[in-house]
Amino acid sequence: MGNVPGKLEAEEYGAMNGRRGGSQKQFRSLSQSSTASSGSAAADSGRSRRATSLVGNLLSSGGVSRAESYGGSAYRRRVAREKDRLREQHALRLVVRSEETVDGGYLAPYGSYRLEKLDYDAPVVQGLIVERRLAPFYTPLQDFDEGWTREELVRVVDSLLLHAPFEEEPEEFEGVPLGNLGVADIDALVDKTLSRREQRRQRSKIFRARLHRKRILWQEEENSKFLELKLEARRTGVSSACLPSDDAKWDLYRNGAECPICFLYFPEPMNVSRCCLQPICTECFVQIKRQEPHFSHDEVDPAQPDEDKDPDLLISTPASCPFCATPNFGVTYKPPADRILGIQGGPPSSYVSACSDPPHHHTEPPPRRTSVAHDHSSVVTSDMIRPDWETELIKERTKLARRAANATAIHVSNRLVDPGHTRGYSNSFASASSTYASNSSMTADFEEEMIRHVMRLSLLDQQPNATSISPGPVDR
């Protein structure tokens, strides 16, 4: 690319001499008129070659150099396998297990929402449930009848499953090869005749289809264990320690409360929004999260291309309350003092109800209390269950900064090899000496601009975690 100007000059000379019959006189005339500027033109050409070389380095530094330094496609395959391993590990944590019980609920969700919606930090949520700072994932009732007797309610609870039934054959995975689920490597299932982009898409779809099938098998295994425990307790009259007694079932569900978001019935107490005191089940709470990184409409023109925007203006807006739209959504939870069961509590099978009074239903709303600040020690916020939100924001800023640097390099490269440069060369060749100063200054500006972007992109590549990019203003 650095030799482009010289090549264009040679072609221009050839075209001029061909049109004029190869006259040596014409060529000598042009040569003599340009003798004074030949030295300066050579210097300008050298500067242009350096500048265009910088463009090449800038365009390749974001991809080729990193690929070479990390082993190219082998590195990308390792990264893909590691991501798959983490996704599978997360899905395994979402399996409901009968022995992982807290106060009559569980550490994993019932399954009212799809896997894509359950992208919270599972260890963090499970820790909050064990600490009794967040309500457990209760198995919900589709309906609740105030007229149910104790025996009827216990029978309904006995019929509940650990997890909602899965869709066996989702339409999106129809015809997708699964292979041997016991073999982790799925590259052999990918059609190698496809383009690289299509191969990546197919690989992602195969992985998701296999993961869906694995989740079904994992949960079916736990469901079978749970059913066997129930049958054994019915046959012998001795319940497993993790199975709730009839008193526990009665006390849990006799005052069922409806979640105003999913409209399912759950045992009380439930989580309560910190701002407007509305009840919300844990499975609905973990769906609520910050907006994806975006630009503020007040500071950035929406019509402006993303690569022209300042990456530091990219923001992540805190989640708002789904009931009253208060920012920094969070909940509080007051665990039942007389029903500490399961992990860090007594065996659910030995629970005995403190009283046998008939169920009472609140006819008056609970007394109001003031809201609690989002940074209060008793509040669990949406950000707490997704602690990597700031890292994701910085990654998006880094990605945008790299795109902007590449776009600038391409723009500068196009200006260096402007077609107008060759068209006007023969007309202005005689006056090259007078225009050299301005051309040299322009090329120097290009070179300085590219050096800045090369250095910026180099910093981004040297620090993959984007610590070199200032986080800028972050909404909390």
Curated annotation (Swiss-Prot):
Keywords for this protein: Cytoplasm
Family: Belongs to the SIP5 family.
Biased composition (Basic and acidic residues): 358-377
Compositional bias segments (type: Low complexity): 28-45
Cited function: May negatively regulate the SNF1 kinase.
Any GO BP: cellular response to glucose starvation
UniProt keyword annotation of Glycosyltransferase present: no
Record region (Disordered): 1-48, 351-379
Keyword Cytoplasm: yes
GO cellular component: cytoplasm
InterPro entries: Sip5/DA2 (IPR039301)
Protein name: Protein SIP5
Compartments, as annotated in UniProt: Cytoplasm
PANTHER family: PROTEIN SIP5
